[in-house]
Regions:
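NTP-dependent small-molecule kinase module
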Residues: 1-30, 42-46, 204-237
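Phosphate-binding P-loop
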Residues: 45-53, 129-132
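Residue-level preference for the first positions of well-ordered beta-strands
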Residues: 53-57, 135-138
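Conserved GTP-binding G-domain of TRAFAC-class P-loop NTPases and closely related GTPase folds
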Residues: 55-59, 64, 76-81, 87, ...
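Conserved substrate/cofactor phosphate-moiety recognition/catalytic segment
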Residues: 68, 73-133, 174-176
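Conserved nucleotide-binding/hydrolysis micro-motifs of P-loop NTPases
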Residues: 97-99, 143-144, 169-174, 226-227
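Glycine-rich phosphate-binding loop used to anchor ATP phosphates in small-molecule kinases
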Residues: 113-163
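Conserved phosphate-donor/acceptor-positioning beta-strand/loop module used by diverse small-molecule
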Residues: 159-178
């Protein structure tokens, strides 16, 4: 069984070779306000800075480290039932919150039977947060399904928010190890499909130079080493 990473970090992983950047390396800066596609894999940056009304999606295949990233920068834990408010008033939405809430009523059913309900509740919470709050909304999503990217982008535009993505790019073996470490494993076939769609998405962004969805203001591609060196994600007026 793989060893667990130190709490709050994503240690010990080399930058992914799955989708090598074709752009010139980003200059080493302490603060970046993303406004386009930024490939920061293997880079060094202290702070990402977004508008206070941003919709920020933290994306990656299962086990990539999305929940750990949310905990590291926003103090969000996935073992609570309701969304947490992080620094700068950000509301943080993780699908595991819906799973914990529903488990009390549906514990007697095998999880695959009520997984669609979890995703429905999660997306209802995303819609409500984008509609009803004025501060930043941070969203946990794999981004490997086009319909989820389109839906979130549509809602963000509908409620006057800029959509930004942080994409955690890690090798499949590392993501699989992350699933074992957290104790939540994805079916092997489903995981393989996630990886295939992720690779296509990375090609779209890095080689075809297209955004993952129309209307996305920025895309930041990072690996675990980059995340570990970052100190904060800020939202400013």
């Amino acid at each position: 069984m793989p060893k667990e990473s130190r709490l709050g970090t994503l240690d010990g992983v080399k930058p992914s070779l799955e989708a090598p950047p074709i752009h010139a390396p980003e200059p080493l800066v302490s603060t970046l306000a993303p406004d386009s596609v930024h490939d920061l894999r293997g880079g060094l940056i202290e702070e990402l800075r977004y508008p206070n009304s941003a919709a920020l999606v933290v994306a990656g295949v299962p086990g990539a480290g999305k929940s750990t990233t949310l905990r590291r920068f926003f103090g969000a834990t996935s073992n609570i039932e309701t969304p947490r408010h992080g620094p700068d008033g950000a509301i943080v939405l993780d699908s595991h919150q819906a799973r914990i809430s529903l488990r009390r009523r549906l514990w007697w059913l095998p999880y695959p039977l009520w997984r669609p309900v979890v995703h429905t509740v999660h997306f209802l919470a995303i819609h409500a947060a984008l509609r009803d709050t004025t501060g930043p909304v941070v969203i946990h999503d794999c981004a490997t399904f086009r319909w989820t990217r389109v839906l979130i982008a549509h809602w963000a535009a509908l409620y006057g928010r800029d959509l930004h993505l942080i994409m955690l790019d890690v090798p499949p073996t590392v993501a699989r190890a992350g699933q074992y470490a957290r104790g939540r494993r994805v079916n092997g076939v489903a995981f393989t499909l996630h990886v295939r769609r992720w690779r296509r998405l990375m090609r779209t962004i890095t080689i075809e130079r297209r955004r993952p969805t129309d209307g996305s203001r920025s895309v930041v591609i990072v690996d675990r080493a980059t995340v570990n060196r970052m100190r904060r994600v800020k939202f400013v007026a």
